[in-house]
Amino acid sequence: MNHFKGKQFKKDVIIVAVGYYLRYNLSYREVQELLYDRGINVCHTTIYRWVQEYSKVLYYLWKKKNRQSFYSWKMDETYIKIKGRWHYLYRAIDADGLTLDIWLRKKWDTQAAYAFLKRLHKQFGEPKTIVTDKAPSLGSAFKKLLSVGLYTKTEHRTVKYLNNLIEQDHRPIKRRNKFYQSLRTASSTIKGMETIRGIYKKNRRNGTLFGFSVSTEIKVLTGIPA
């Protein structure tokens, strides 16, 4: 499938712009300046539209390609401010720090945790263990899941120090707080960021970071010869 058909700019320009924004802590205007220095004149609002469109495409392709998970998961929620209001990002990672899934919600409650865990179960099945913090909503969600026959073989652990990995993993996302304009755009942007970080982490785990290029990785993911 040609994901770049009908665009005014060449696909290489779009890939570089989207890759810069999702990989590095840059604003849309800063990406615009970097492209301008390379002789490419593109407005920051156009870059914004590209990021919103292709973040969702990349996340879908990444999820489709990576359906396996390890026996141990870590799940947590963090606060993200969007236009002055707090929202809640649920994230789950495996033992190597690779992102399994994310979910951005307006509320932090049992129903949101239940729905997210149910979605994880549908995608990956049951892990041997899940490590979370001691939030009451998570404990209630697990009880509700057990009552419908889900996660019956999974040990739910709430030892605080075991969850340090995912708490550290929140930081790059939270640094972008000031750029999130709505729940929808924040969700799209975070999906793109998680995809690129997931690719980076997987390459690091496999020992193939030498010569890492975000543009090349996006091309590979979208089926374009690198």
PLM feature spans:
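Helix-centered, glycine/charged polyanion-binding patches within enzymatic domains
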Residues: K134-K191, T195-G198
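Two-metal-ion RNase H-like nuclease active-site motif
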Residues: S69-I82
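C-terminal domain-tail junction helix/linker
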Residues: S188-T195, Y200-A226
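DNA-recognition alpha helix
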Residues: S27-I40
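Short, basic alpha-helical nucleic acid-contact segments in DNA-binding proteins
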Residues: R49-Y71, V148
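Active-site beta-loop-alpha junctions of metal-dependent nucleic acid enzymes
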Residues: I102-F124
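Mobile genetic element proteins and their domesticated derivatives, centered on retroelements
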Residues: A17, V31, I47, D76, ...
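Basic, short loop/linker segments at the boundary and entry of helix-turn-helix/winged-helix-like folds
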Residues: M1-R23, G39, C43, Y48, ...
